Amino acid sequence: MQQHPGNTVIVTGASSGVGLHATKALTARGWVVVMAVRDPVKAEAAVRGLRVPMEQRLIMELDLASQQSVRNFVKAFRATGRRLDA
């Protein structure tokens, strides 16, 4: 299993279903996951249940149905200074 320590990936819909399980799998391989979600409170509760380390996740609000939300997400992600690896 290839490890990716410190690399950053964005997962949309990361508060439930496939997105949440992708977050768990990616963090297990060393990725830092930007969890792009509509409801950050729901995402925090969900990820806490999976015991994903805080240093390997960043929860950010994103509603893909809203162009303004997408713009805000991009601006906020850029402000983190993180490089996007995948």
Where are these regions (language model features)?
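A glycine-rich helix->loop->beta "capping" turn
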Residues: 5, 52-55, 76-86
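The beta1-alpha1 cofactor-binding region of Rossmann-like NAD(H)/NADP(H)-dependent oxidoreductases
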Residues: 40, 60-75
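Short, well-ordered alpha-helices that flank and scaffold nucleotide-derived cofactor binding pockets
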Residues: 24, 28, 48, 75
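Conserved Rossmann-like nucleotide-binding pocket used by diverse enzymes
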Residues: 10, 58-60
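Conserved glycine-rich Rossmann-like NAD(P)H-binding loop of the short-chain dehydrogenase/reductase
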Residues: 29-45
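Generic leucine side-chain signal with a strong bias for well-ordered alpha-helical environments
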Residues: 20, 26, 50, 62-64, ...
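Canonical Rossmann dinucleotide-binding motif of NAD(H)/NADP(H)-dependent dehydrogenases/reductases
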Residues: 2-34
